[in-house]
Amino acid sequence: MKQVLITGGAGFIGSHSADALLAQGFAVRVLDNFSNGKHANLDAGAMTTGRLTLVEGDVRDAACTDAAMKGVDAVLHLAAQVSVPRSVADPVESSTHNIAGFLNVLDAVRRHKIPRMVYASSAAVYGVPEALPLTEANTAKPMSPYGLEKFINDQYAALYRELYGVSSVGMRYFNVYGPRQDPKSPYAGVISKFADGLEGATALRVFGDGSQTRDFIYVGDVARANALALQGDVTGVLNVGTGTSVTLLELIDAMKEAFGKPAVVRHEPPATGDIAHSATNPARLTLTLGWAPVTTFVEGLRALAQSLRAT
């Protein structure tokens, strides 16, 4: 049985990726500092049997990261500081997670001669799109320290492939949503915040007129993409999205139906630096890994609503 190390494996995308890998017969080791992840996100049954093991630590700690690498066959690196506003407020602190932490992981993969690394890049590297839909060939023009950090990750990964032969691919996630995304977290996406508003009967804040578009992708489909990438040999970067975008007002209508609740929308002035439209073409992901999204937008929203009512 092959073993995969997931950094940030108790978090939102990480825990779903752990579930996907466990379902495919892999053993999983999770490295997490629980600054954002939760013990409740981890499969208790798999921990009891030993198929899922936990190392509590931080990727910024080189010795801890090195120790967690021992005996693993692949690494899924998801640990990060993922708040764009936080990166703007404190770029130096953000870089310790997203550049220094990334480099600790990447270099440990090199030293331990681990055959495969998949890591979280981001659609934030593109900045304001020159044209839509976005492909991997689009020029990177990050608008935040977070986006720049992710682009630097991509450059380091490319250099390590060239210099040391480290096989890696960066997953440029678009707008991921689904169960276990904490709406109270500063990292929460718009869907989890709207879900919290619907459940709490509070107004949904929309910055601008609501015509902004986003490519929303269900976390289970992201987890499948991660699992496929770990087992593949494609390198470089891959856009991870559905190829379909919806406006925020369309999103609210769909959520009202999925949650079975009315919504009060409060329009506020447009947010500074907000990107009006975003969508990707996931053709390279489909071509190289045979991936396609299987969860419709309505199904994903219903799964989110059901998970919130179960907690």
Where would I find each of the regions flagged by the language model?
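Active-site loop immediately N-terminal to the catalytic Tyr-X3-Lys motif
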Residues: 91, 183-184
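C-terminal substrate-binding subdomain of Rossmann-fold SDR/epimerase-dehydratase oxidoreductases
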Residues: 198-311
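Hydrophobic alpha-helix immediately C-terminal to the catalytic Tyr-X-X-X-Lys motif of short-chain
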Residues: 152, 156, 160, 190, ...
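Residues in well-ordered alpha-helical elements
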Residues: 63-66, 73, 85, 92, ...
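N-terminal Rossmann-like NAD(P)+-binding domain of SDR-like oxidoreductases, especially those catalyzing
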Residues: 1-174, 295
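Short amphipathic alpha-helical interface segments enriched in basic and hydrophobic/aromatic residues
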Residues: 39, 77-80, 195, 199, ...
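A conserved pocket-lining segment of Rossmann-fold NAD(P)-dependent short-chain dehydrogenase/reductase
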Residues: 87, 137, 166, 172-182, ...
